[in-house]
């Protein structure tokens, strides 16, 4: 597959139009807005950048790389192990249901689009529940997208969803959101680099320590007025 074909596949996977429901989640951002921790463009950008560098880069992003390697090697047992491990690290019911719903939607799409070899689709279908990183890495391997490229798209898509949530809930203007997203480019690249370092370590250096995110997510479950499901 040529680099251009890989780029098109990557754009497809990272598209906001991918029908997996990412737009309906804020991952604690709405609760941070409700309690006043996020209240303008600067605080929203700080929240998203810190989440990328100190949460995503330490757990989900390196795990994403490990899953990509497992799919590429055809190691179904290790795929299941990492999928179950990631699900167990979701601290609240909202965060757990988020990754399960999006993972299920993407795995169903992979089956309907017939992406990848039958054995990949069968392995994915056998996982229940399936988490989003597991399904997304399966799609990348099926479409021959390289690991770091796929992770960069995954992290950018996450940041894009966070900016969209901030625009709706703070609220912010569309241009302010685009300025914010542009300034987050370097944070996305730094996240990929840190995730690579952690995934390459022996054993892999994964950290799920994010107490404020867990508390805000738990608070969001009983928040009086909500736009988002997390």
UniProtKB/Swiss-Prot annotation:
Region forming the signal peptide: none
Family matches, as InterPro entries: UreF, UreF_sf
Keywords: Chaperone, Cytoplasm, Nickel insertion
A cellular component term, taken from the record's GO annotations: cytoplasm
Chief location bin: cytoplasm
Subunit and interaction comment: UreD, UreF and UreG form a complex that acts as a GTP-hydrolysis-dependent molecular chaperone, activating the urease apoprotein by helping to assemble the nickel containing metallocenter of UreC. The UreE protein probably delivers the nickel.
HAMAP family: UreF
Name of the molecule in the record: Urease accessory protein UreF
């Amino acid at each position: 597959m040529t680099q251009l074909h890989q780029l098109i596949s990557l754009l497809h996977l990272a598209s906001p139009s991918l029908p997996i429901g990412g737009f309906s989640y804020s991952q604690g951002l709405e609760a941070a807005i409700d309690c006043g921790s996020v209240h303008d463009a600067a605080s929203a950008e700080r929240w998203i950048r810190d989440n990328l560098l100190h949460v995503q880069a330490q757990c989900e992003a390196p795990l994403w790389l490990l899953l990509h390697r497992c799919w590429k090697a055809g190691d179904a047992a290790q795929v299941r192990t990492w999928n179950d491990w990631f699900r167990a690290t979701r601290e609240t019911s909202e965060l757990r249901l988020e990754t399960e719903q999006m993972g299920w939607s993407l795995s169903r799409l992979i089956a309907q689009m017939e992406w990848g070899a039958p054995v990949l689709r069968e392995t994915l279908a056998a996982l229940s529940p399936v988490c989003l990183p597991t399904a997304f890495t399966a799609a990348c391997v099926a479409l021959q997208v390289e690991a770091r490229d796929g992770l960069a798209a995954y992290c950018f898509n996450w940041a894009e969803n966070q900016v969209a949530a901030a625009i709706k809930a703070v609220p912010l203007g569309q241009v302010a959101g685009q300025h914010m997203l542009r300034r987050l480019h370097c944070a996305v690249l730094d996240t990929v680099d840190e995730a690579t370092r952690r995934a390459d370590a022996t054993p892999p250096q994964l950290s799920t320590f994010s107490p404020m995110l867990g508390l805000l997510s738990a608070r969001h479950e009983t928040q009086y007025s909500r736009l988002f499901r997390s």
